[in-house]
């Protein structure tokens, strides 16, 4: 269920766990040193990519993405949650580490995930994170990303991966103003991260 504006929404994600998220448009919440994060894996062309989605109050607060380099950033495929830790260096610069618990209960830390990612993708991710931190509704963030017209095919493919990652956090039943391409009715709503027509059942994911 979800209310418009500053809201609390609760949805059943993957029919296993319930996710609660609060949206505060225009309000920037202070970032704790460590915040919980989800891992979303996706394809960028033929390459395997990964997204770290940092969460505040259950909603996306920041997102970092890049190509999976197993020799530099191996994370077991079954690991889909962890923590993003903000570390301030002695010289005043900052970095972000990712921390997770392995199957044996040991804490594993990958230091400086920002250095592992292509700078161009990192900068786009920082831009998107800035919008998320200001509490823009996820549907609006997705629409903003969709409206970006980028020259590089690789970046456009990456953009689609980010859209898919964020759509997972849109509450089931959230309506849009889109017309169904199948029946023409304005009855499109999100279900399990996919746009679904409530009239004819047409569905589009990704």
Model-derived features: where do they sit?
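Non-catalytic terminal/interface segments that mediate subunit docking, oligomerization
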Residues: 21-118, 180-206
């Amino acid at each position: 269920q979800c209310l418009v504006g500053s809201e609390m929404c609760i949805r059943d994600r993957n029919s296993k766990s319930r996710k609660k998220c609060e949206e505060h448009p225009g309000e920037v919440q202070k970032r704790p040193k460590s915040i919980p994060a989800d891992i979303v894996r996706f394809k960028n062309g033929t390459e395997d990519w990964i997204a770290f989605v940092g969460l505040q109050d259950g909603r996306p607060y920041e997102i970092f993405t890049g190509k999976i380099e197993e020799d530099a950033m191996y994370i077991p495929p079954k690991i889909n949650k962890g923590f993003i830790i903000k570390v301030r260096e002695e010289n005043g610069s900052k970095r972000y580490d990712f921390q997770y618990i392995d199957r044996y209960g040991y804490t594993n830390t990958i230091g400086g995930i920002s250095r592992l990612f292509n700078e161009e993708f990192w900068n786009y991710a920082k831009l998107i994170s800035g919008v998320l931190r200001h509490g823009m509704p996820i549907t609006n963030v997705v629409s903003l990303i969709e409206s970006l017209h980028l020259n590089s095919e690789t970046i456009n493919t990456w953009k689609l991966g980010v859209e898919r990652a964020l759509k997972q956090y849109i509450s089931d039943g959230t309506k849009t103003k889109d017309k169904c391409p199948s029946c023409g009715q304005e009855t499109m709503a999100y279900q399990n991260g996919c746009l679904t027509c409530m009239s004819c059942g047409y569905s589009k994911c990704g």
